[in-house]
Amino acid sequence: MAEYSKLYITNNGQALMAKMIAGSGNIDFTKVCSSSTQYTESQLQALTALSNIKQTTLVSKVTRTNEVAIKIDAAYSNVDLKEGYYMRTLGLYAVDPDKGEILYAVCIEKSNNCYMPPYNGVTVSAAYLQLYTTVGNADNVSLAVSPGAYATVGDIQALEKEIADLKAFVGYSDGDIYGVEVDFENKKFTRLAGAVNRSAGSGFDGINAFGGRKRCNLTNDGRVAAYYGEAGFSTTGKLTQAVDRNPVGTESPDENLKFSAGTIVQVMVEQPKFYYKVVPLKTEKRTKGAITRKIRYYVSDTPKAGFKLHPAFIVNGQENDVAYLAAFEGSLWDASASAYILDDSQVADFAADMLCSIANAKPLSGLTQNATRGNIRKLAEKRGTGWEQGVVQTASASQMLMLIEYATFNMQSVIGNGAVSKTDDGKTSMTENTGATITLGNASGSVVNANGIQIVSYRGEENFWGNIWWWIDGINHYANATTGECETYVADHGFADDIKAAPYEDTGMTAKYGNGYISAFCYSEDFDWLFLPGEFNGNTALPVGDYCWNQNGTGWRVAVLGAGWNGGLGAGAFYWGLANASSARSRFVGGRLVYRKKVAA
C-alpha cells in the first residue's frame, strides 16, 4: 500500500498564498503530476519543477474542508501508459497571476511500493488521489475544474449509489437479482426482476442462494465430511465409513480432507452467502422506526450496488462464505455415557453435554430439565468454536429466501401445515422424531408419518415450524406493557440474556406488545433484514398468516420461533413467541444448532 508524506507547500506556493491573503487574487489549482524521481522531504520546499514526470492529470474536484484548507481530488489511469514506473513524487500545480503556472505543493511516496503498470490491452489500472493543503483563506480558491478531468472514484461511487437507489425504487430488471414486492395493505405479492415467471422449487434450483443449500455432515471443528447423496453421508451422528475428499490420484493428499469411520458429525444445511436489499416503498412511523405497508425484498448471489451481505454471514466483523444450519431439531449428546440421547430423557448436564442435529431422535425439550435459552446456548457452544444455537440472523436468512421463492409469508399454504395438529395432553413432550424428511434430501416439501402427522422441510431444514418451538439467540427484547412497545436489541456474537450493552445494538424499532396475527413487520434501515412483528390485524392466511405471542407484562424477554405440535394455522416460518422470560423452560421448547466461523470477541 502506498504511503505518502505530508504535502509540502513550495516557496512559490507560499508566495502565491501571500498574494491571495493580500487580496491580489484567487488560487486556481490546475493539475497534478507524478514523477519517478525520489526526492527527500528536505528538498521539497525549494522545488520549482519536477524531473522525470511520467503522468499528468487534471484536477477533478476542489472541496473546501474548513476556512483555511481544501481537498484536491485527482485520478490517474494507465490506458495511455507505454512503460510502467514507480510513483515516487506527486506535485500539485496552481496559477500565479504574475508567474503563470507554478509548482504549489509536493509530497513523496515513502514505501516504494506504488507502481503504475503499463497498459497491456486488457487490465486497466488506476490511482485515486486526495491531497489536502492549506491556502490561508479557502474562500479565495477557485472551485471550478476542467471538464476534461477524470471523474474520481468518489464521484463514481456516489453516482452508482444514486442509480442503485433509483433502480430500487423503480424496480430492478436484472436477471440475476430476485425479488418480491409485498403490499401489506392490499395483501398482494408480486414477483420482481429475475424472479418473474419463476416457480418455487425447480425455478430457483439454479440460483446458488437457494439451490446451493445442501445437507452435509459437519465435524466439530467445522469441516464438511460428506454431502447428501455421497456414499459416506450419514444421519446417525457418526460416519459409518471412512471418507477421503481428496481427488482420486492426488500425490500429496490433504489430511484434513480425510475422515475415519466413527467420526462425530452433525447433519447440517450448508447455506451459501448472498446479498440483499430491502426497499421500503411505504412505511408508517412509530415512536422508534416504522412498520411496513409496502416493501420490496431482493437477493443476489453476487455483490450489487446498494446491496449488503446478509448478516447471517457476518460474525463480529468477519465475513464468511457459508453458514451451516441444523437439518433437524436439536437432541442431546450425553458426555457421561458418550452416547446420543434418542428419547428426550431429561438427563442434560448443561456444563458437559452437547446439542446435536441427527435423525431418528426425539427433540430435546424442557419437560423437567432446565432447558432455558441460556442453557441450550451452553450445550451448543460446548461443541466447539463457531457453534451456537439458532440465531436471529440465520433464521432471518431462511425466512427471506422462503419469502422470495414462494412470494408469500404463509409457508403453511405452499409447503405444508407441518406437525401442528395434535391435541396437547397437558403433560408430555409430544414431538415426532427427527429425520422423517431424509428422503427429500435438499428439496422442499413434506412427508406424512405413519401416524398421519405431517413433517415439513425447506431446502434441507426440517421442521423450521411445527413439532417444537426453538430458542432464537442474538435477540433480546424489553417489553413495556404500559406503552405497548417493546425495545429490541440484536448481537451477532457474545450472546447473553437480559442485556442491551455491547455487543448488542439497538435495532431502532419497537415490536408490538400483545398477541395476534401479524399484519406488518417493523422496519429500520440498519436492521431491514429482521422480520419483527409490528402490528396484529391479520388473519390465518394474509398478509402473513402467522401468529405472535408478545404479552407477559413488563420486563426482559427472549424469543422462540416456529410453533409446537399444537400450533395449528397460527404456526409458520414467521410465528414468533416473544413473551418468555430468560428463566423459562418448557416441554414445548427446544433448540437447533448453527455453525458459523468467527473471530474472538
Task: Annotate the PLM regions.
Residues 258, 262-265, 302-464:
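Short aromatic-cysteine micro-motif
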Residues 38-39, 97-99, 274-277, 329-332, ...:
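Acidic glycine-/aspartate-rich tracts in secreted/extracellular proteins
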Residues 81, 86-155, 274, 278-280, ...:
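Beta-strand-rich solenoidal segments
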Residues 393-396, 420-433, 439-440, 448, ...:
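C-terminal, surface-exposed recognition/capping segments
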